[in-house]
């Protein structure tokens, strides 16, 4: 109740007068003051909030701009706020960078969601090739005897046909598994080997798909904003999402063996504990979670 009242009071009264007072004192609008004071994710986050809570329709709409309209949007903002480019030459550059990050994050979510919604299709030759590629990357010295085979359990699938394990995350789960195995082959082999530990073992592929869901949910909830705003100076792409996934895979394996669960039956408990740890790290405005080998 108190928080709701404070937000109402701040948004409708206090914020307006504070902005007015600061403009009189500094001769600069709130957006300019943010650029003068902050860098990295803090800057983009504060710009996004300033635009979102502005009563000015031009500024409000800026958070919804598509990438192709960013340049024109920046010009509209400068006109609306009476910013002279000759007196503040950096404003245009800084605002464009922020809007590209803001619009890029929204577009990245749409791109990831689009891939996630595509189910694995065994009649799709590209899907089948990708699945076989995963096997060859993880088991280079062992030939897959048949497409439907108990051998899939060797890399952590549950049944004889892996397509059933991709239902939740669609083709996105497979793409992530292949990306990690292709770009961090040595680490993938090491983690696959560790996943066969007699006591602390887990299903490598199933856990990998589970971590795709974690990465996706963090992106959807906007928890990845600080990370991506710091990690990517321009427009975040699927490549950056895959990189974050790789970080999760590597760090989860370390976490699992450090925690030493009594059995795989406690997977959900430790998975959630790991999830909370990552969410905590992502609250830091200076965060940049990159895989460091």
Swiss-Prot record:
Domain ELMO: from-to ranges: 126-282
A single GO BP: regulation of defense response to virus
Keyword tRNA-binding: no
Keyword Membrane: no
Keywords tagged on the record: GTPase activation
Example GO molecular function: GTPase activator activity
UniProt xrefs under InterPro entries: ELMO_dom (IPR006816), ELMO_domain-containing (IPR050868)
A GO term from the CC aspect: protein-containing complex
Biological role: Acts as a GTPase-activating protein (GAP) toward guanine nucleotide exchange factors like ARL2, ARL3, ARF1 and ARF6, but not for GTPases outside the Arf family.
Name this protein carries in UniProt: ELMO domain-containing protein 2
